[in-house]
Amino acid sequence: SSHEVQVQIGNYQHKQISFDSTGKIDDDGRFLYRFSGVGRDSGTTVEHIDDQRFNLAPSLTWNIADETRLTLLGQFNRDDTGGTSQFLPLQGTKLDTPAGKVDYNKNLGDPDWEFYDKTFYALGYAFEHRLDDIWQFRQNLRYSKLELDNQIITAGGWSGAVSDDGSVSRGANVYDENISHFAVDNNFQADFSTGALDHTLLLGLDYLRVNTDYRWLYGSAPSSNIITPIYGRDFSGVTYGALQDYNQKRRNTGLYLQDQIALDAWRLTLGGRWDRLETDSVFHNASDAKDSRRDSQFSGNAALSYVFDSGFTPYLSYAESFQAEAGGSGGEAFKPSTGKQYELGVKYQPPGSDLLLTAAVYDLKRQNIVTTNVAGATEPVSEVQVRGLELEATGNVTENLSLTASYTYTNSKMTEVGDSRDKN
């Protein structure tokens, strides 16, 4: 058994208590449990914005037999905070104004009107059964529900938003989001050899259902001041328009096959996945327009590496992706995004150590990803290219000292865009 309680006290009146308890329920160890949780009450770097969280995550494992195990999983999370992102105006931050500079922690919203309330819960299980010395079966199932209510004020956003006396024009944003998520993954794994080749074969079928109700309302909020903010303004007269208001049901069925092959120090991974995506949408902000689309795609992946006795493992990988994009525009759902990524890297683990050092460079291209334009509307971008470098170190330096360090550099640009957008 293991039991841990942690208490934190920090800046901005930060107070947090967390616990993690795990152990046997019976003497034979057929039933195991784990129960963790977090309670937090804190301020933030933004004036008048609190950060409160309550989280519980219980789990129960039943070792039904030597070859069979079932783990029940649960989670509940409640967040109650405000608009920490702030959306400060260009004038008074990057640009000088006669009124002066905006302090980094200044709240240009209205704590009497703004809030961020999120409730999330999930239930599921993980089932494992070994059929024989070669085959084993796994099934993972999860249902989750997200409810989000958010009101936030955006300050500025255009060249004339701030007057010489510090008065700032603002926008009022109201978000309502409800997402239910059901996922089940079934797979068989086979470990076997063919001559000098050792195989780990994975064959699976998964299903995902996502129902989304999303609404984003926007209106002109009462003005404030970047130096002496005005709180407690009357928002009852604000007229809102729906930037987004839709109901969307997505169903994704995927069939996948992967083989990891080992020959002496060589490692080769070959895999493929076929997806069938069904999307049905109703856009209430577009005269209740209805849209149904059916998409399918094959995605492949491959990786090759060589494990040296010295602990170095250089590798090269290629992967394709196919992913649904939530929402739509003009009464039509967005196309799924696709991607291709090449990665070249090296891993180093000193013999007899659990310290792992990794360095990698990658080139990623994605098509049909969704972004938000300056008017607040979402729209697809034809193609984005991201190139980057990643360095990472993890492990235990000594028995009492662990290390986690990372560095990431990315360079992204739009390589194909519509006529109405400029390349960056």
Question: Where do the model's predicted regions map?
Answer:
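Structural signature of Gram-negative outer-membrane beta-barrels, strongest in the C-terminal barrel
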Residues: N63-A65, I179, D198-V210, Y246-R366, ...
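Acidic/polar loop-and-plug regions of large Gram-negative outer-membrane beta-barrel proteins
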Residues: R40-T44, A57-N63, E67-R130, L148-I179, ...
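Gram-negative outer-membrane beta-barrel transporters
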Residues: A265, D363, P380-N424
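Outer-membrane beta-barrel translocator/receptor signature
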Residues: S1-P58, I64-T68, Y121, L355
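Face-selective signature of the C-terminal outer-membrane beta-barrel domain
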Residues: L123-L146, R170-F283
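Outer-envelope beta-barrel architecture signal
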Residues: H3, K15, G29-Y33, F54, ...
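Residues on the lipid-exposed face of transmembrane beta-strands in outer-membrane beta-barrel proteins
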Residues: F19-G23, P58-W62, L123-H129, V184-A190, ...
